[in-house]
Amino acid sequence: MTRNVRALVAAAVMFATGTAVADCWQAVSAKYGLPVALLKAIAEQESGFDNQAENVNRNGSRDVCMMQINSMHFAELERRFGITEQKLKADKCTCLDVGAWILYNNTQRLGPTWDAIGAYNAGSQDKRERYAWRIYPRLEKYRAAEQR
């Protein structure tokens, strides 16, 4: 009986966590006016939705969490919002919110364009274009899934 209760509690926690993350996509989308499909396309491209993903770049900076937030943002995130690197790695919703905030700022600076999407990952124009072309098929996949 105890084993069944533990299994039931574990299943309930997993369901509740999954529901909370699903709600997070909608909330962040509404907060920044960015489509869920676009946010998912970026999260898939950046990390395959892995919130424990960490990468070191050639310039020595690091990218963390599902949205691969670059370490160049860490000081500002902590100063303005109290968000630490550890919080990004521990909380998918916080990671998603910060990634959307970065993308939103790009759209404010560059307009709602593929260039703004490319700037999420790259500084130079040619790299922005390559990144945008990686996002496009993923975006179409998630748009199609929303239509079902």
Regions from the PLM with identified roles:
Residues 16-19:
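N-terminal signal peptide c-region/cleavage motif recognized by signal peptidases
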Residues 11-14:
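Short, linear, compositionally biased motifs with a strong N-terminal bias
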Residues 1-9:
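Bacterial N-terminal signal peptides that target proteins for export
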Residues 23-148:
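Catalytic glycan-binding domains that act on GlcNAc-containing polysaccharides
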